[in-house]
């Protein structure tokens, strides 16, 4: 399921529907293709779901679709579970892919410098610890 939630600073809505089927590869490619054409600098995508439900697969497809839009070769998109952050540069876009699964305390977040670069696109797996942040976001619930 893909759900869009409005937050105080949200500039635009990417998806207006509350439920989108991404249970198969064609559906996943369709939604990531749509998002890849609408996503803008400064957007935040928060990915919720249990282990193994497809958060990194969603991210991989989205980043590869953005690369395709810019006629760039697809790069390998891996889960940032151990290094917490993987960064991708696609022309003038900087995409930061975070996995906050191992972050347990708010103080640890401060070391990550989340949201400091207003033009970065942030894709965040396991964003539950961010509840104290007021950010504009698009939330993806898998599972």
Region annotations inferred by a language model:
Residues 50:
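P-loop (Walker A) phosphate-binding loop of NTP-binding proteins
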Residues 9-34:
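N-terminal pre-Walker A segment at the start of P-loop NTPase domains
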Residues 2-5, 18, 105-106, 115-143:
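Short phosphate-coordinating micro-motif centered on Lys-Gly-acidic
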Residues 45-47:
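Hydrophobic anchor at the beta1->P-loop junction of P-loop NTPases
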Residues 55:
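Conserved lysine of the Walker
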């Amino acid at each position: 399921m893909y759900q869009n939630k409005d937050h105080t600073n949200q500039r635009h809505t990417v998806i207006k529907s509350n439920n989108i089927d991404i249970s198969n590869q064609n559906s996943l490619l369709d939604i990531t293709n749509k998002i890849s054409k609408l996503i803008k600098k400064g957007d935040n995508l928060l990915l919720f779901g249990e282990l193994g439900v497809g958060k990194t697969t969603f991210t991989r497809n989205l980043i590869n679709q953005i690369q395709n839009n810019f006629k760039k070769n697809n790069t390998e998109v891996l889960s940032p579970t151990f290094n917490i952050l993987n960064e991708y540069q696609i022309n003038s876009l900087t995409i930061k892919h975070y996995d906050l699964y191992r972050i347990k305390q708010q103080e640890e977040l401060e070391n990550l410098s989340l949201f400091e670069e207003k033009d970065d696109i942030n894709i965040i797996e396991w964003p539950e610890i961010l509840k104290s942040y007021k950010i504009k976001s698009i939330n993806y619930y898998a599972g």
